[in-house]
């Protein structure tokens, strides 16, 4: 039996590929090609960021319902013990290495990375902060 390769997508990729109505970002074509035939997953952090962004932007009922439907159809990695352990290890290693992901304003990014690390799945992200992060396979 062939297993479908999976990819965790960061919030920027998820938003651009699945939620934006006008898509003129030059990275979209490459991301679409990479994701073709792959199982797309998101982190609980991405779900939270999408919902917070939509509520802050005061999306209308229809657009909010569409976003929730898309989120509900997308497998979401929850913060189980593996994810929490991966997060703790990532924090310690980033501090030891002086990697930028250690910064306070990257807490959400660390959770996304920890989800990918814990489940041994690559991460597709448009944010360069992930490059060189320990134990993380990044595509972008």
PLM features: residue spans?
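Active-site neighborhoods of divalent-metal-dependent phosphate/nucleic-acid chemistry enzymes
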Residues: 2-3, 75-122
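Acidic active-site catalytic centers that drive phospho-/nucleotidyl reactions
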Residues: 10-12, 109, 127
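Generic structural signal for small/hydrophobic residues in well-ordered secondary structure
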Residues: 10-11, 50, 87, 116
């Amino acid at each position: 039996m062939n297993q479908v390769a999976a990819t965790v997508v960061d919030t920027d990729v998820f938003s651009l590929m699945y939620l934006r109505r006008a898509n003129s970002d030059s990275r979209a074509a490459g991301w679409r090609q990479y994701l073709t035939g792959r199982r797309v997953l998101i982190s609980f952090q991405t779900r939270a960021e999408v919902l917070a962004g939509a509520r802050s932007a005061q999306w209308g009922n229809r657009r909010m319902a569409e976003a929730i439907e898309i989120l509900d159809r997308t497998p979401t990695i929850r913060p189980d013990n593996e994810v929490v352990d991966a997060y703790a290890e990532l924090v310690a290693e980033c501090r030891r290495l002086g990697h930028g992901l250690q910064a306070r304003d990257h807490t959400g990014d660390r959770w996304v990375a920890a989800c990918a690390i814990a489940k041994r799945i690559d991460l597709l992200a448009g944010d360069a902060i992930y490059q060189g992060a320990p134990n993380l396979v990044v595509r972008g």
